[in-house]
């Protein structure tokens, strides 16, 4: 049976709409409803704003239910058009700005694209994030062992346990230089910590995963293979976890966590500074 959509939700911004999406999604996750999400970035002129209003109104006319609208828009004339729609509109930034304005006794100076745009004040941070992404891509899955000492964290684990997506998320979201190193089936007969990693043990972090989940993931990649067999997965996970214990490497079972949660736990456990972009 198909899921019935309870509410249509719009995330609207005159910038990237990332802030509207993140905060709006966080709010909607509190309710047991099925939603249909529509993200509309760069609503920067009246013509586009009117088209967005028409889209909101059309859904209301089709469903008889007011769409929920989370928006972050600087220009008052654009906001006014969106507020004329049949949606239930929430200014996610102003809801926080108003009490802060009163507390700090300062007037805000809103500028479009300030949060996620490039400006002279954040170019160094942006360059650092791009450098972190480049580094992480160059050191994915053990591709290169050069300059490993420049990594802020080195993720270890068996194939398909979440090393690559976690590394990339750390780089893209937090500007962390994250390398990762795989343990493959051929390593299992005499699994030891590679010589190149021993001097960097303080940077090592191990990922593990339930064998049943690992087998299901691998089955999608190589169906009916030894690589994907539950027996093989159990053996590899057991060997890797024993290595972590022997070398006192902090580790995390990734089975029931999202990439965002895994990355955040790694930052916390390893004491790495979060950088928001």
From Swiss-Prot:
InterPro entries: Kinase-pyrophosphorylase, PSRP. It holds the Pfam family Kinase-PPPase. The keyword Lipoprotein does not apply. It catalyses: [pyruvate, water dikinase] + ADP = [pyruvate, water dikinase]-phosphate + AMP + H(+); [pyruvate, water dikinase]-phosphate + phosphate + H(+) = [pyruvate, water dikinase] + diphosphate. ADP binds at residues 157-164. Its EC number is 2.7.11.33, 2.7.4.28. Signal peptide: none annotated. GO terms for molecular function: ADP binding; ATP binding; phosphotransferase activity, phosphate group as acceptor; protein serine/threonine kinase activity. It comes from the Bacteria. The keyword Transferase applies. Keywords: Kinase, Nucleotide-binding, Serine/threonine-protein kinase, Transferase. Bifunctional serine/threonine kinase and phosphorylase involved in the regulation of the phosphoenolpyruvate synthase (PEPS) by catalyzing its phosphorylation/dephosphorylation. Belongs to the pyruvate, phosphate/water dikinase regulatory protein family. PSRP subfamily. This is Phosphoenolpyruvate synthase regulatory protein. The lineage of its organism: Bacteria, Pseudomonadati, Pseudomonadota, Gammaproteobacteria, Enterobacterales. The gene is ppsR.
């Amino acid at each position: 049976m198909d899921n019935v959509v309870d509410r249509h939700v719009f995330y609207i911004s005159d910038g990237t709409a990332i802030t509207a999406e993140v905060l709006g999604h966080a709010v909607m996750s509190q309710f047991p409803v099925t939603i249909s999400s529509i993200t509309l970035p760069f609503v920067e002129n009246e013509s586009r704003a009117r088209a967005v209003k028409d889209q909101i109104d059309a859904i209301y006319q089709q469903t008889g239910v007011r769409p929920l609208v989370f928006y972050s828009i600087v220009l008052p004339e654009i906001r006014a058009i969106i507020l004329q729609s049949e949606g239930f509109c929430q200014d996610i930034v102003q809801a926080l700005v108003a009490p802060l304005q009163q507390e700090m006794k300062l007037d805000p100076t809103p500028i479009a694209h300030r949060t996620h745009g490039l400006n002279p004040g954040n170019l160094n941070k942006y360059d650092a994030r791009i450098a972190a992404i480049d580094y992480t891509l160059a050191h994915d899955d053990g591709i290169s062992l050069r300059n490993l000492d420049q990594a802020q964290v080195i993720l270890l684990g068996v194939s398909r346990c979440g090393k690559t997506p976690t590394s990339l998320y750390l780089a893209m979201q937090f500007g962390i230089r994250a390398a990762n190193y795989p343990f493959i089936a051929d390593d299992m007969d005499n699994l030891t910590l590679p010589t190149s990693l021993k001097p960097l043990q303080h940077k090592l972090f191990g990922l593990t995963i339930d064998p049943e989940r690992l087998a299901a993931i691998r089955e999608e990649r190589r169906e009916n293979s030894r690589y994907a067999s539950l027996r093989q997965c159990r053996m590899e996970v057991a060997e890797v976890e024993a290595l972590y214990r022997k070398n006192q490497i902090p580790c995390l079972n990734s089975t029931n966590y999202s990439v965002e949660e895994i990355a955040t736990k790694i930052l916390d456990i390893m004491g790495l500074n979060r950088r928001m972009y």
